[in-house]
Amino acid sequence: MNHFLDIHKTAPEDLRQIIDQAGQMKTARLGRPKGTPDDEQPLAGHMVALIFEKPSTRTRVSFDVGVRQMGGETMVLSGKDMQLGHGETIADTARVLSRYVDMIMIRTFDETVLTEMAEYADVPVINGLTDRTHPCQIMADILTYEEHRGPIKGKKVVWTGDGNNVCASFLHAAGQFGFDLTFTGPAQLDPEDEFIGFARNAGSKITIERDAAKAVEGADLVVADTWVSMHDSQSSKERRHNMLRPYQVNDALMAHAKPDALFMHCLPAHREEEVTSAVMDGPQSVIFDEAENRLHAQKAVMRWCLGV
């Protein structure tokens, strides 16, 4: 039994196994209707709990479809259903759920909820997102880059904007997969030293560059994410927009990257804010392949967790 809590907590050889299997499983499904089962049914007889303290379209649909394609069943629970940490402890909830299901995926605001769930659960726990990291997204991103351009090892990735949870997992991946990462954004939004330190200690070149055009020079991959959250106040949104406007990904910025550089965004995107429609819909964008690959990467993660 394996938990998938964070990229830096998973061995590089296991991460590589997951990526390779995801690619194989994707190829095996080419041309099939989405609702048809996989030839292999490794999750037959398995029940998977999908817990959403923080709602999501892509995470819910991709995990639900993935489980069903592999022969399993899902139970979707919202924060209202669970009341995690209010009344019954997270530890007791983990123990009880372990009697009903074979695996737990949780998308939560608080990383401590994830770690405590994993500590006390008797079944694998998968990090569907926390406010600190988003490892499943990055596995999809690695899969996407490699199916378009080959091995990501030694490549230059540029993260633009806010050093958020997705950026943190990209830094973990830099260390585990052996690529370099440049962060370009305002100093107030730098990624935490912990994430930068992990990647540097693993041998990756991590650079902080305030000038977006300089940062993107020679990039193999440029990545953006939303500047604001639905929970931000109007004044906070305006402040962040003013701070981040110099880091918008547009055609002029992409011109500084390599001619064959790719653009990624985990979606949903705010068009004409962090990225222009011209880039999103342009030939360098692989955002919809990236969205699809959440499905294939997570299927491989689930198989690895269960050892099937």
UniProtKB/Swiss-Prot annotation:
InterPro entries, alphabetized: Asp/Orn_carbamoyltranf_P-bd, Asp/Orn_carbamoylTrfase, Asp/Orn_carbamoylTrfase_sf, Asp_carbamoyltransf_Asp/Orn-bd, Orn/put_carbamltrans, OTCase_ArgI
Pathway linked to the protein: Amino-acid biosynthesis; L-arginine biosynthesis; L-arginine from L-ornithine and carbamoyl phosphate: step 1/3
Family the entry assigns: Belongs to the aspartate/ornithine carbamoyltransferase superfamily. OTCase family.
Catalytic activity: carbamoyl phosphate + L-ornithine = L-citrulline + phosphate + H(+)
Matches recorded under PROSITE patterns: CARBAMOYLTRANSFERASE
Residues that bind carbamoyl phosphate: 56-59, 83, 107, 134-137, 266-267, 294
The protein's name: Ornithine carbamoyltransferase
Enzyme class: transferase
Domain of life where this protein originates: Bacteria
Gene Ontology biological-process annotations: arginine biosynthetic process via ornithine; citrulline biosynthetic process; L-arginine biosynthetic process
Function description: Reversibly catalyzes the transfer of the carbamoyl group from carbamoyl phosphate (CP) to the N(epsilon) atom of ornithine (ORN) to produce L-citrulline.
Binding site for L-ornithine: 165, 225, 229-230
Key words of the record: Amino-acid biosynthesis, Arginine biosynthesis, Cytoplasm, Transferase
GO cellular component terms, semicolon-separated: cytoplasm
EC id: 2.1.3.3
Alphabetical list of Pfam families matching this protein: OTCace, OTCace_N
UniProt-annotated location(s): Cytoplasm
GO function term, MF aspect, one: ornithine carbamoyltransferase activity
Keyword Amino-acid biosynthesis on entry: yes
